Curated annotation (Swiss-Prot):
The gene is CYSC. Pfam families: PALP. Keywords: Amino-acid biosynthesis, Cysteine biosynthesis, Lyase, Mitochondrion, Pyridoxal phosphate, Transferase, Transit peptide. Belongs to the cysteine synthase/cystathionine beta-synthase family. This is Bifunctional L-3-cyanoalanine synthase/cysteine synthase, mitochondrial. The keyword Transit peptide applies. Residues 1-27 form a transit peptide. It is found in: Mitochondrion. Its EC number is 2.5.1.47, 4.4.1.9. Its cofactor is pyridoxal 5'-phosphate.
Length: 368
């Protein structure tokens, strides 16, 4: 039975200092009797039946954008992380951070209350893992995020607290810390500070890209939220080939990594308004800026031209990749990016505003 492969670092719940580093890996194992959590040993050994849903995480495919990149001069391949169990790249770090804390004895199902600030997808992935493992989950989230996110989190049994949209992710983090201080047996995985968030991409996402491209990737470009993906993948690819270029992506309206100021934008999950502790600025060759409107338009274009129904951050990543593909120095190169989430999660957002209104106004036709 395959499991996600990851080597993780131990971190204190309250201190930002890493006080102990321990290497451990999820690995593919087989035994005479696979045990399903909370049940008797699984008797059907040798079958391709997974013993729990977490074993579905990882090994997402790369797809070439033949139409979008046509005439650009370079080749763009996109890793479809929307094909994870909860349709999001965040399934990887959610699993890694929870299992890392469990192995260190920091949390235990039925006792620990997990508390986490989120802009949406990480919260869904954590709620999914908490439901599977038996944890109570409390999430704080800015109220500007989509209705779909709220419903999915609640469907997994998580408690959800919405925060003032004008305070951005900073306000969401502050509220989560307040809840942590007042909750007995509360524990925060701290996605913005937890090195397991980065390391899981170093140990899984990066190697998958390297293997699937047979080491031919020239450029990797990725939107920056917590910074875990771009940092982990970037480190791995550069460890294999120092000449690989790594680019981050942030909203033009909230371009703090390029010296600007935080501000409202539509690229949910990116541009959190502060520099996360785990973000490795040194691994990136540059941070590109993408306007929200352009990201929305590209996400719509991907559905119509490539048959890929993706979210707004996927549109932003594709815009950035296309910009790089058009540069003369990148002619003939292979550019890899990621589609972090599935578009159906954005039905109530600006991405589908016109189509939603059109659908709402549809009238039935008579049938003779």
């Amino acid at each position: 039975m395959a499991t996600v492969s990851s080597c993780l670092l131990r971190r204190s719940r309250t201190a930002s200092r890493i006080f102990k580093t321990s290497l451990r890996c999820f690995s593919t194992t087989s035994s005479s009797a696979q045990t399903v959590s909370g049940s008797s040993p699984f008797p059907f050994t040798g079958t391709n039946i997974k013993t729990n849903v977490s074993q579905l995480i990882g090994r997402t495919p790369l797809v070439y954008l033949s139409k979008i990149s046509e005439g650009s001069g370079a080749y763009i391949a996109v890793k479809q992380e929307m094909m994870q169990p909860t349709a999001s790249v965040k399934d990887r770090p959610a699993l890694a951070m929870i299992e890392d804390a469990e192995k260190k004895g920091l949390i235990s199902p039925g006792k620990t209350v997990l508390i986490e600030p989120t802009s949406g997808n990480m919260g869904i992935s954590m709620a999914f893992m908490a439901a599977m493992k038996g944890y109570k989950m409390v999430l704080t989230m800015p109220s500007y995020t989509s209705m779909e996110r709220r419903v999915v989190m609640r469907a997994f049994g998580a408690d959800l607290i919405l925060t003032d949209p004008d305070k951005g992710m900073g306000g969401t983090v502050k509220k989560a810390n307040q809840l942590l201080d007042s909750t007995p047996d509360g524990f925060m995985l701290q996605q913005f500070n937890n090195p397991a968030n980065t390391q899981v991409h170093f140990e899984t996402t990066g190697p998958e890209i390297w293997e699937d491209t047979q080491g031919k990737v020239d450029i990797f470009v990725m939107g920056i939220g917590s910074g875990g993906t771009v940092s982990g993948v970037g480190r791995y690819l550069k460890s294999q080939n120092p000449n690989v270029k790594i680019y981050g992506v942030e909203p033009a309206e909230s371009n703090i990594l390029n010296g600007g100021k935080p501000g409202p934008h539509l690229i949910t999950g990116n541009g959190v308004g502060f520099k996360p502790e785990i973000l490795d600025m040194d691994v990136m060759d540059a941070v590109l800026e993408v306007k929200s409107d352009d990201a929305v338009k590209m996400a719509r274009q991907l559905a119509l031209q490539e048959g890929l129904l993706v979210g707004i951050s996927s549109g932003a990543n594709t815009i950035a990749a296309l910009d790089l593909a058009k540069r003369p120095e990148n002619k003939g190169k292979l550019i890899v990016t990621i589609h972090p989430s599935f578009g159906e999660r954005y039905l109530s957002s600006a991405l589908f505003k016109e189509l939603r209104e059109e659908a709402e106004n549809m009238q039935p036709v008579p049938v003779e």
